[in-house]
């Protein structure tokens, strides 16, 4: 696509999962679709990027938008794939969770969800024997809470809720550990309502890691939709940076994008689907066009961003577990907790045990990552020297856990993914936005900041499916 004008039914801003899902569904219905993507690959921050040596590095393109993860639940995604006529190759993780406490070296296996967590309550969350009944009661109440209870509990954090509702200090600690293991560096700040939703959101028969036959890692979740869009006559304009969603007279008229020389291509369309986090929409549509309370909520949600630091290692072969003498075969997630306080230190996985294209033939890829919440600041507030020291401490633990890690490493490098990355706001004690905004007809906000009873990553599929259905109704 060069400078000029294109007429379309729908313009999609960003090729994150939601945009690709929506585009595949809409083109199947014969709609004219143009996807504007400023980078040179699809997937935004949710896919993977290939190194020249054939390794696929998750968490997307440096200049992409939206967020991602390295595993996924897949409920709404399965519905979307059926509606789009797209096949997604997924590898189910049979042993989804392994917990490491370091430096002492305790290693425990477990599963996600209320039943799995209660089964491991004593070992995983160190719940005292005389507190187990109370823990079971609280988790059961969370898992059964109705929509009204969830909504009422949404603005309350565990830090304020636990002292009033849980009598046993060991149970309070166990519930905070539970939130840490699920995914929160600061569990006392997690929303009680969101924890209820975690136990109830449909997740499909997962977790999964994509296992595409052509591309590796999370890019395997992105490319099948893109192939469908292109094969049905849709256009994915790579290298074109959206600079404006055109709104005039209270309705959408399309979008404007520029190439690297700032020359313009205008896509004229009555519907625009934006896949960016909600506060980034204001770079494309003046925030004064939105209701004041909408803008306030969007900026508040922005304060719950996180970035991601990590370490990636290409392996010549799989390492050997020191304690057993066996070659590593755990394909699930490894959560790392440090010290007696069980502080969050991220986790790791060997992606190549599930994704056949994530590493060159015969080789493997290990990724270790830690999310850092901004907590209302403009950055995580942690200098790189401290962050690197935390990573090095975790890497040193891996050298103790594995007998021969250094001998397996072909290359390694630190990773630093600027915010926003990871669905850190999934735990925020505030309501998120809806698909449509009063007063702007034809604008559909389908990023991962959408309010939805959906798991991380799967929320993108939900957003894309919802946006496609609404666009079809508008058209």
Residue ranges and their predicted role:
Residues 2-127:
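N-terminal glycine-rich phosphate/pyrophosphate-binding loop and immediately adjacent elements
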Residues 31-33, 272, 411:
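Hydrophobic anchor at the start of a short beta-strand
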Residues 241-361:
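Mid-domain catalytic core of redox enzymes
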Residues 96, 100-197:
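Rossmann-like flavin
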């Amino acid at each position: 696509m060069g400078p000029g004008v294109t007429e379309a039914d729908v313009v999609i801003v960003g090729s994150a999962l939601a945009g690709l899902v929506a585009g595949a569904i809409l083109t199947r219905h014969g709609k004219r679709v143009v996807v504007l993507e400023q980078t040179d690959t699809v997937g935004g921050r949710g896919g993977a990027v290939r190194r020249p040596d054939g390794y696929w590095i998750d968490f997307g393109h440096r200049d992409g938008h939206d967020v991602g993860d390295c595993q996924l639940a897949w409920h709404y995604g399965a519905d979307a794939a059926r509606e789009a006529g797209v096949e997604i190759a997924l590898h189910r993780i049979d042993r989804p969770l392994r917990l490491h406490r370091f430096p002492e070296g305790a290693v425990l296996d477990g599963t996600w969800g209320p039943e799995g967590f209660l089964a491991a309550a004593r070992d995983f969350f160190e719940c005292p024997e005389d507190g187990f009944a109370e823990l079971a009661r609280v988790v059961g109440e969370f898992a059964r809470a109705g929509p009204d209870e969830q909504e009422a509990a949404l603005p309350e954090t565990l830090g304020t809720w636990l002292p009033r509702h849980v009598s046993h200090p060991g149970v309070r600690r166990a519930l905070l550990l539970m939130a840490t293991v699920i995914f929160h560096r600061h569990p006392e700040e997690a929303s009680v309502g969101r924890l209820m939703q975690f136990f109830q959101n449909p997740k499909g028969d997962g977790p999964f890691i994509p296992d595409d036959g052509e591309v590796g890692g999370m890019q395997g979740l992105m490319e099948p939709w893109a192939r469908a869009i292109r094969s049905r006559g849709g256009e994915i304009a790579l290298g074109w940076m959206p600079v404006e969603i055109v709104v005039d007279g209270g309705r959408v008229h399309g979008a404007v994008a520029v190439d690297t020389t700032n020359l313009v291509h205008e896509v004229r369309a009555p519907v625009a689907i934006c896949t960016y986090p909600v506060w980034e929409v204001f770079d494309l549509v003046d925030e004064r066009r939105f209701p004041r309370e909408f803008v306030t909520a969007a900026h508040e949600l922005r304060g719950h961003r996180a970035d991601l630091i990590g370490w990636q290692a290409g392996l010549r072969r799989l390492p050997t577990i020191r304690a057993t003498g066996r070659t590593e075969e755990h394909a699930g997630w490894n959560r790392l907790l440090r010290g007696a306080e069980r502080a969050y230190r991220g986790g790791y996985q060997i992606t190549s045990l599930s994704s056949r294209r994530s590493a060159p033939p015969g080789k493997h890829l290990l990724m270790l990552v830690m999310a850092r919440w901004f907590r209302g600041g403009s950055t995580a507030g942690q200098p790189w020297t401290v962050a690197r020291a935390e990573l090095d401490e975790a890497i040193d633990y891996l050298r103790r856990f594995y007998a021969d890690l250094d001998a397996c490493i072909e290359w390694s490098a630190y990773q630093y993914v600027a915010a926003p990355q990871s669905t850190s706001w999934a735990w925020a004690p505030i309501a998120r936005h809806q698909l449509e905004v009063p007063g702007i007809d034809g604008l559909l906000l389908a990023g991962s900041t959408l309010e939805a009873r959906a798991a991380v990553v799967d929320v993108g599929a939900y957003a894309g499916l919802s946006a496609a259905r609404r666009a079809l109704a508008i058209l």
